[in-house]
Curated annotation (Swiss-Prot):
GO cellular component, one term: nucleus
BP GO terms, sorted: positive regulation of transcription by RNA polymerase II
Entry keywords, A to Z: Activator, Cyclin, Nucleus, Repressor, Transcription, Transcription regulation
Classification via Pfam families: Cyclin_N (PF00134)
Protein's UniProt name: RNA polymerase II holoenzyme cyclin-like subunit
Subunit annotation: Component of the Cdk8 module of the Mediator complex. The Cdk8 module is composed of srb8, srb9, srb10 and srb11.
Gene Ontology MF terms in the entry: cyclin-dependent protein serine/threonine kinase regulator activity; transcription coactivator activity
Primary role: Component of the Cdk8 module/Srb8-11 module which is a regulatory module of the Mediator complex that regulates basal RNA polymerase II transcription. The Cdk8 module may sterically hinder the interaction between Mediator and RNA polymerase II leading to transcriptional repression of a subset of genes regulated by Mediator.
Predominant localisation class: nucleus
Localisation: Nucleus
Family: Belongs to the cyclin family. Cyclin C subfamily.
UniProt source species: Schizosaccharomyces pombe (strain 972 / ATCC 24843) (Fission yeast)
Amino acid sequence: MAANYWASSQLTQLFLSTDLESLEPTCLSKDTIYQWKVVQTFGDRLRLRQRVLATAIVLLRRYMLKKNEEKGFSLEALVATCIYLSCKVEECPVHIRTICNEANDLWSLKVKLSRSNISEIEFEIISVLDAFLIVHHPYTSLEQAFHDGIINQKQLEFAWSIVNDSYASSLCLMAHPHQLAYAALLISCCNDENTIPKLLDLIKSTDAFKVILCVQRIISIYYFEDIE
């Protein structure tokens, strides 16, 4: 397991090192928003921590990006499996029987999910991702900013919810976790003239332009449905 993001597979193997502007059409869409809502709905039913759901959606997005051919798995089956896998990765395992039962109760699937279905899809996802399953999230940078006294509890909670909302897009594949965290902090602290200078000092350590692009993309999430 790579404790250091800069040495992790997330950066060295799975990061989309491209311009956010060129990927705007695929960064946010009805599909990405719907996928995140499905993950949240199923995760809430299982009463899982937000970090588990975030890992699940990242695994789902990685898989959908890298798969070479259509396997015919339904979105619901993929979500259930990604959450099952995410629970293992985040060390809060849920029994496969519980995953199947809750999925079948929640969704009216043509074919009921079985343990063998989940195991098959789990193997497929692990194979496609070459077993690179560890996910680094922006939450760590948010917590660090709070512990360093840069932000207060209310600002931390607001930024946390903004990071949660960012998973409705594919930004998690295109920006470094700390850049997403800084973008969320800029939004949550935009009216605090005492905190903004401290955040600007933080941003100096990274690509400030990309942080601003992340701010724009995150804000667009809240307007997307109105625009559509």
